[in-house]
């Protein structure tokens, strides 16, 4: 799996687990809804690290916790 797909799936899984909409994540993270939506829908590449940090803050997790999921075990470079 490509890194961008693993990041995308991880965000989707975390928002589903926490019953958080993209709109709510946008408000909590300070990242625009259009930016989040574009990434989740595969219209843009992986977010920059600082953007991912804000997304993690919006989800209430640490950045290192984000990457501990099994999705990242055999990830390939984009």
Description of each model-found segment:
Residues 1, 38, 67-78:
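Short, charged recognition helix plus adjacent turn
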Residues 1-20:
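A short, Lys/Arg-rich alpha-helix, primarily the initiator
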Residues 12, 23, 53:
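Residues within the helices of the helix-turn-helix
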Residues 15, 26, 56:
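The alpha-helix within a helix-turn-helix
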Residues 20-38:
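Short alpha-helical DNA-recognition segment
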Residues 32, 43, 70-74:
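The DNA-recognition helices of helix-turn-helix-type DNA-binding domains
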Residues 43-54:
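Short, basic-rich loop-to-helix N-cap that marks the start of a DNA-contacting helix
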